[in-house]
Amino acid sequence: MSVILEHLPTGQKVGIAFSGGLDTSAALHWMKQKGALPYAYTANLGQPDETDYEAIPRKALEYGAEIARLIDCREPLVREGIAALQSGAFHITTAGVTYFNTTPIGRAVTGTMLVTAMKEDDVNIWGDGSTFKGNDIERFYRYGLLVNPDLKVYKPWLDSAFIDELGGRAEMSEFLQKSGFDYKMSAEKAYSTDSNILGATHEAKDLELLSSSIRIVQPIMGVAFWRDDVAVKAEEVTVRFEEGFPVALNGTTYADPVELMLEANRIGGRHGLGMSDQIENRIIEAKSRGIYEAPGMALLFAAYERLITGIHNEDTIEQYHENGRKLGRLLYQGRWFDSQAIMLRESAQRWVARPITGEVTLELRRGNDYSILNTDSPNLTFKPERLTMEKGESTFSPRDRIGQLTMRNLDITDTREKLLTYAKSGLITLSHGSELPKLNSGEKN
């Protein structure tokens, strides 16, 4: 049985994720006029472009909400962001530059916390502003039903009656003005922005054209590092981790992870660290493009992965990367709390993150240009004396290496025989002189 309501349920409580923007303001007032009982829930996600969170619920009451609540999601959001960092749960990269899944993390927290608040108010119908072509409609759907199995979903943007009356920004603005509200539609940007304390997403409109570059974006978490008139001075920063958790920046320890993330954002933002331009596959498999900011996450991740490479062995690091990519996809798809995601995350937090204690000093320059100046940890397995070319005590001798190389003869012989087998079947041509083996078409002559 479908839990999607295609038409407004009049006379019933309808929870709406209320941002205070034009879309949700018009939707809330429209639902009130049509006979529903709107309950407004606003998530404080530490959005860097929001200046007055307390004013948002007051707006909702003015537009007709029965009640309006502000839910502080910042601490859980930072906690989940650090869990994603510990797990390397990031699968979208271009030439080594990472998207830190900041919007999917935000949706996991928003979806669960707002529906929990609605449940407390006996509200079992939820509406939000996600569109039918995007990822969020599925993310919110999954997280909402995980929290409340009796939840019904009503989205004004899937209701033909709402679309017919208020299908565009101009129509919504006119509707509010005719209803007696002094709502002035803000100048429309060349792209849309969604943000939280972990990062910002810029997408749609002009950014749907690949010929429109990062240059049209005005960062909200840092500087436009690509502009020659923007001064960016090199800066040294030290990040300290204890058992996988970031705890200090430049010698200052933070008991509150929210304050630590805010300071990491300020430091990274001064350089434009963590900005990326990505082409990605949405949940529905259509490709989209986004320009992302995540200065604090990028700073912490650079230090975290440096410690990982100095502490863990190659096989552990390989498994961490493989599992992280899988977990990143699950997170992106709205499956952060699914059993397979919990398994991958728990494994990384327990066996990879726990030994990560130490300090990393970096020099930040412009954008994602930085150098690592020092790495220190009591758990380092990096031991220069093991490989020193100078005379002195050594962990192994030349004779030990001769024995190790002799043992390699076994698999070298196996490889040679396998190449001969491939050559006989026509798959490769054996080398002559200095040539390497060459692949053939694979077809027998």
Curated annotation (Swiss-Prot):
Pathway field: Amino-acid biosynthesis; L-arginine biosynthesis; L-arginine from L-ornithine and carbamoyl phosphate: step 2/3
Q: What's the chief localization of this chain?
A: cytoplasm
Q: Where along the chain is L-aspartate bound?
A: T131, N135, D136
A biological process term (GO) from this entry? argininosuccinate metabolic process
Superkingdom classification of source: Bacteria
Q: Where does L-citrulline bind?
A: Y99, N135, R139, S192, T201, E203, E280
Q: What is its EC number?
A: 6.3.4.5
- What GO MF annotations does this protein's record show? argininosuccinate synthase activity; ATP binding; protein homodimerization activity
- Gene3D superfamilies this protein is in? 1.10.287.400, Argininosuccinate synthetase, chain A, domain 2 (3.90.1260.10), HUPs (3.40.50.620)
Work out whether the entry's keyword set contains Transcription regulation: no
For binding ATP, which residues are annotated in this chain's numbering?
A17, F18, S19, G20, G21, L22, D23, T24, S25, A43, G129, T131, D136, D194
| Gene Ontology annotations for the cellular component aspect, listed alphabetically | cytoplasm
Query: Sorted alphabetically, which keywords does the UniProt record give?
Result: Amino-acid biosynthesis, Arginine biosynthesis, ATP-binding, Cytoplasm, Ligase, Nucleotide-binding
Q: Which reaction does it catalyse?
A: L-citrulline + L-aspartate + ATP = 2-(N(omega)-L-arginino)succinate + AMP + diphosphate + H(+)
Q: Where in the cell is it found?
A: Cytoplasm
SUPFAM superfamilies to which the protein is assigned, alphabetical? Adenine nucleotide alpha hydrolases-like, Argininosuccinate synthetase, C-terminal domain
Outline the subunit composition. Answer: Homotetramer.
- Family per UniProt? Belongs to the argininosuccinate synthase family. Type 2 subfamily.
In Swiss-Prot or TrEMBL terms, this protein is called Argininosuccinate synthase
State the organism of origin. Answer: Acidobacterium capsulatum (strain ATCC 51196 / DSM 11244 / BCRC 80197 / JCM 7670 / NBRC 15755 / NCIMB 13165 / 161)
